[in-house]
Amino acid sequence: MSERLFVFDTTLRDGEQVPGCQLNTVEKIQVARQLEQLGVDVIEAGFPVSSPGDFNSVIEISKAVTWPTICALTRAVEKDIDVAADALSYARHKRIHTGIGTSDEHIQYKFNSNREEILERAVAAVKYAKRYVEDVEFYAEDAGRTDNEYLARVVEAVIKAGATVVNIPDTTGYCLPEEYGRKIKYLMEHVDHIDRAIISTHCHNDLGMATANTLSGVQNGARQVEVTVNGIGERAGNTALEEIAMILKCHRQMGIETNINTRRISATSRMVSSLMNMPIQANKAIVGRNAFAHSSGIHQDGVLKNVSTYEIMDPKDVGVDDTSIVLTARSGRAALKHRLSMLGIDYDDPGKLDKIYERFLCLADKKKEVTDDDVLMLAGADRKDSHAIKLDFLQVTTGMGVRSVASIGIDISGQKFEEASTGNGPVDAAIKALKKIILKQMTLREFTIQAINKGSDDVGKVHMQVEHDGHLYYGFGANTDIVTASVDAYIDCINKFKTAG
């Protein structure tokens, strides 16, 4: 009989720490609902004390989802725990995730403290959190570099204090898989009453070993894994949810199973990628567009004879289905609504669906077929409806051997502004014209263009990074016209620093 492994998703907390990947509350709810459909056991919804936005997001996510446990992160600080408990008040199943650094590096340089004081603070935090909730998870930050004997003392003490889950993070991504596995095994063998709590993994990917370390932890007794969709996260990212889910599905001999509905992996991956403006690496395991592509002649020949020659997974097991409905200009609202639902996006408001359908028809008139990525892009355009600064019109004249000229119209909170400029190419001319209206000192730091699919009629995605007053702001634009997409991305940056200011 298989043992149960609990999946703790931290896409909305740790995953959102990627620069430029911040979501608003509506988008976070959308992801949380998709994670519920995916079958995750715990959703870490945010760090409530860090900002009013995170606090509100935890409240709204608690209201929006039904069966997963909603978790809020805190430091080992009473105020943090108070705020987290308040944010979780609407959650049907709630957990407070509190903790403190336990490595000598953290104790000495971060806390200017000693081991005994850190141990006392850890126990006090768990006891304080237990006043609010039964389910308390403790994290020993930088456990990967904490010596096993002291770590075991901390784990034993917090379990005695009432911790129901103990998280052993490889915070810096330093551990080798064998080393991390031995650490979990040591705890399982040396901590009294270890059976009273679930040991959890939380691995970072700085050396590319997050998934391997997580798997090693599971093989040695951990029964919760902390993961993110597409492996997104701070620095080099976290353990990828889809990788752990499919490893266990492919290796049933391990005798460990999750509650993940793997057929929703692809849709979840694309939703997160679209909302966070974070392109998926083409050769990314499980969810990259090349994950099930075969270009080598020898491989193609084998697959044509029998797919098992080179494919260890059925693409349909992760939700990749080549027989899906093709959307064109003749597709109706029902077909679009069905496709949105398949991608995890449900619209109860007919007005919002009508608005997306109008955008869909405009795009379908320009393209032969509208793909799933296009649909996600159209749905994501909702976030810009509330922006104070919007593009009204754009006209560009360009050619070989001549300076490009751009005329642009901008709507700023209902007021219309127009300007024109020349430039070294159409994008440069359009951005210069826009700068004449905005009159802010901004420096373009990063500019990337990506085609969503293939074809001359494809939608281009532009990711942009702009520096203003010492701060970096990230913008995104998508359009069949790459100049318009570039201007949209620049305006997105401006709206973000206007909101931040």
PLM regions and their residue ranges:
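Non-catalytic terminal/interface segments that mediate subunit docking, oligomerization
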Residues: 17, 22, 30-31, 365-473, ...
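A mid-to-C-terminal "edge-of-domain" accessory segment
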Residues: 4-5, 11, 246, 253-420, ...
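Alpha/beta enzyme core
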Residues: 5-7, 17-42, 55-64, 78-199, ...
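Short, ordered loop/turn segments at secondary-structure junctions
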Residues: 47-48, 73-76, 100-102, 141-143, ...
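Catalytic alpha/beta core domains of metabolic enzymes, predominantly
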Residues: 175, 181-305
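Short beta-alpha connecting loops at secondary-structure transitions
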Residues: 67, 170-171, 226-234, 249-258, ...
